[in-house]
Swiss-Prot record:
Protein name: Small ribosomal subunit protein uS19
Gene3D superfamilies: 30s Ribosomal Protein S19, Chain A
Annotated HAMAP family: Ribosomal_uS19 (MF_00531)
GO molecular-function term, one example from the UniProt record: rRNA binding
Taxonomic lineage from the root: Bacteria, Pseudomonadati, Pseudomonadota, Gammaproteobacteria, Vibrionales
Source organism, top-level taxon: Bacteria
Function: Protein S19 forms a complex with S13 that binds strongly to the 16S ribosomal RNA.
InterPro entries (alphabetical): Ribosomal_uS19, Ribosomal_uS19_bac-type, Ribosomal_uS19_CS, Ribosomal_uS19_SF
Length: 92
């Protein structure tokens, strides 16, 4: 179920402070965060946010189409390496 409109979007305060500071100074350095649950807001457009995927920080460049989505949607946590090949078929 989606979040109530009267509450507004959720964003961690520590991340919001970093975003506002980067916008003020015009800094283009990636903002490192572990907050995958934070929603992308319009002030983040044009910034690069390094989102943690459990192993490393994945750089995510925020565009206009991403507004309203969560940061974690753009940093996949699982890697799919394919199913094991059939060993009998390889020998022939």
């Amino acid at each position: 179920m989606p979040r109530s409109l009267k509450k507004g979007p959720f964003i961690d305060l520590h991340l919001l402070k970093k975003v506002e500071k980067a916008v003020e100074s015009g800094d283009k350095k990636p903002i490192k965060t572990w907050s995958r649950r934070s929603m992308i807001i319009p002030t983040m457009i044009g910034l690069t946010i390094a989102v943690h995927n459990g192993r490393q920080h994945v750089p995510v460049f925020v565009t206009e189409e991403m507004i309203g989505h969560k940061l974690g949607e753009f940093a996949p946590t699982r890697t799919y390496r394919g199913h094991a090949a059939d060993k009998k078929a390889k020998k022939k």
